[in-house]
Amino acid sequence: MDRKRKLICDAFKVKKLRGSCSRDETDLKTSTSPYPDFTEDPHGAVSYLCALFPRKLFNDTLPPLFLKHQLYSLMQDRTVVDRLLSSLQQKGEVCLVQTGFDLDTFMVVMTDDLRRTALSSSEGDSRATVVRKFLDCDLLLSPNISYGRDEMMMKHRFSDGEITQLVRAGLLTVRDAGSWWLAVPGAGRFITHFIKGRKALLSQIRRSRYKEVLLTDLSTRKAPPNLRLGMEFHIHDIIGAGLVDCVPTASGILLRISET
């Protein structure tokens, strides 16, 4: 793995055993956080994060995207998040999309939004017919995040040439020989901004005294230039990914750079 790819992989790593805040901190967290707690309304958390996505930054050419772990910053129980997404996948309402850098890191996109933007991006293109064929079959409604050769070629009758066109259209990426990940056309631009924004926000906190900052203070600061996705979007990222510890204080939640 070359150095550039390693840096990207490191940027997407999520600390698996860390919650956004511990259960003992629940009451203090909900009373002092500037953001809503969706413990009683899990579906609302999905809509909330979608609404944070800066459509204008991408000229409305991307569907609203967020990272799965960002939901962990809005609900106290990670199991609830996992069950919610599994249920929405089974219903064909959301798609989980592999980022390609860490097997445990997924982008979340509403199925209808992905369908709409994929059709729009291929309009007038030579690949429009095969894109529509892909969107009209039940692959998007499947809870699978990748597809094998038998499923693509035998069950859904896609030829090698059509699969190649879907890869070029950005709806598939090669997983390995004979299998493909579902993808979002143009998502590379989002990933670029996401990585730069995460690094910029963590750097800002590291420069603070004791490498910590009150959540309420951070949330009201003007976003530095590299936070193109927005301050709140990135705050939910670093909390949900366990890159900062949430420390309850009399003044509110303190975000401290995690050293573990």
Swiss-Prot record:
<protein>
    <recommendedName>
        <fullName>Winged helix repair factor 1</fullName>
    </recommendedName>
</protein>
<keyword id="KW-0677">Repeat</keyword>
<keyword id="KW-0539">Nucleus</keyword>
<dbReference type="GO" id="GO:0016301">
    <property type="term" value="F:kinase activity"/>
</dbReference>
<dbReference type="InterPro" id="IPR018865">
    <property type="entry name" value="STK19-like"/>
</dbReference>
<keyword id="KW-0227">DNA damage</keyword>
<keyword id="KW-0238">DNA-binding</keyword>
<dbReference type="GO" id="GO:0046579">
    <property type="term" value="P:positive regulation of Ras protein signal transduction"/>
</dbReference>
<keyword id="KW-0234">DNA repair</keyword>
<comment type="similarity">
    <text>Belongs to the STK19 family.</text>
</comment>
<dbReference type="Pfam" id="PF10494">
    <property type="entry name" value="Stk19"/>
</dbReference>
<feature type="region of interest" description="Winged helix domain 3">
    <location>
        <begin position="186"/>
        <end position="260"/>
    </location>
</feature>
<comment type="subunit">
    <text>Monomer in solution. Homodimer; when bound to DNA. Component of a transcription-coupled nucleotide excision repair (TC-NER) complex which assembles and interacts with the multiprotein RNA polymerase II complex when it stalls at DNA lesions.</text>
</comment>
<feature type="region of interest" description="Winged helix domain 1">
    <location>
        <begin position="38"/>
        <end position="110"/>
    </location>
</feature>
<feature type="region of interest" description="Winged helix domain 2">
    <location>
        <begin position="126"/>
        <end position="185"/>
    </location>
</feature>
<comment type="function">
    <text>DNA-binding protein which is required for efficient transcription-coupled nucleotide excision repair (TC-NER). Acts as part of a TC-NER complex which assembles and interacts with RNA polymerase II (RNAPII) when it stalls at DNA lesions.</text>
</comment>
